[in-house]
Amino acid sequence: MQFIDEARFVVRGGRGGDGAVSFHREKYRPRGGPDGGRGGDGGSVILRATEDLQTLERYSRRKVISAGRGGHGSGNNRAGERGRDVVLDVPVGTLVYDESGLLADLAEPGQTFVAARGGEGGRGNASFATSRRQAPAFRELGLPGEEREIRLELRVLSDVGLVGLPNAGKSSLLRALSAARPRVGDYPFTTLTPQLGVVEERGYARPFVVADIPGLISGASEGRGLGNRFLRHVARARLLVLVLDASEDPEGAERTLRAELGAAGLSGRPSLVVLNKVDLLDAELRAYLGEAFPGAPQVSARTGEGVGELARLLERRLRELERSAEAAPRPGHRVFRPSWRGLRVERENGAYVVSGREVERLALKTDWDNPEGVEHFQRELERRGVMGALRRAGAGEGDEVRIGDVSFEFR
């Protein structure tokens, strides 16, 4: 299976079912009271994070994913069936975008996000009966479901991200730290996809995940090499470990890594420098690097030297980061409710254009082939202040008014 970390497709919620116009019928009551039921809501397209997937490969060729349509209402106040939801499993660590920006970050197993909500079912005529209007003969149409193009971007979730130039020994270090068995070789970009390993030792507070991220080269922040695909996965690690080849200009390698992380806006991330391949150095050079990189662990992934001490150091650093995160304030939760506020009336090409979420929904729900339904629509416009807003804007008898895709004459 290919490692695909990006996918783009259209999601479409199901249309809501139409309400019914029906009257109760029984012996001696040939035209009883209204009993038309409402239409069922359309199904939604829902994304769900799971640990059972590691790639977005299953969505790489999908173009449109649609949920089910709601059933129409019927007599005896029977509501239509709800449309079938479509649940799309995605790997933990998937970010969801549309043209406006980030919509969701699915960072926990089981976390869900409604990518396209189904349309609301229309009310049947039973819902419009009042003491003054005892036999309404109109209903509402179901609303269309939401539709948008989304882009999924997978960023591997890890506690520790190993970053370094090609052949710095990251894959060997991952293998030494954990039970992971990545490919290892002496050529650029041995690792073309992120590799994960779990470090689990007796006495640790909890196991932690280490990711070997594809090798970084100068210019990655501008798209060179594996470019932004590398940086995407680095951004999710809680602690970055800069793995330097101690035998090949470690000072220059650190400068390159710091510069690329800084250009990508990642310079503020918690980090630790590790000198690898120290088994290739003599005692004098080791001492020099100890002064040039004070506090940096010196390890050899090949011989295992210093690897145990490094694992314990990483575990301590992660615990410190957890304590800092627990002390940070949490953002508040905001709830948005539909409102008739924000209604706009504008003049456009000789017509008065009315815009606003609720007034556009009302127009979509109206059955324009039913005169009673049109009268109800006009009464709602008057009651909600839309007609008053049109008059204040200068609308007069016979002027064209547009609401969404609906056009009618002002009266």
Swiss-Prot record:
Pfam families: DUF1967, GTP1_OBG, MMR_HSR1
Record localization: Cytoplasm
Region feature (Disordered): 20-45
InterPro entries per UniProt: G_OBG, GTP-bd, GTP-bd_Obg/CgtA, GTP-bd_prot_GTP1/OBG_C_sf, GTP1_OBG_dom, GTP1_OBG_dom_sf, OBG_GTPase, OCT_dom
Principal localisation: cytoplasm
Domain OCT: 335-411
Top-level taxon of origin: Bacteria
Domain Obg: 1-157
Cofactor entry: Mg(2+)
UniProt record similarity statement: Belongs to the TRAFAC class OBG-HflX-like GTPase superfamily. OBG GTPase family.
Quaternary structure and partners: Monomer.
Protein name from the UniProt record: GTPase Obg
Provenance organism: Rubrobacter xylanophilus (strain DSM 9941 / JCM 11954 / NBRC 16129 / PRD-1)
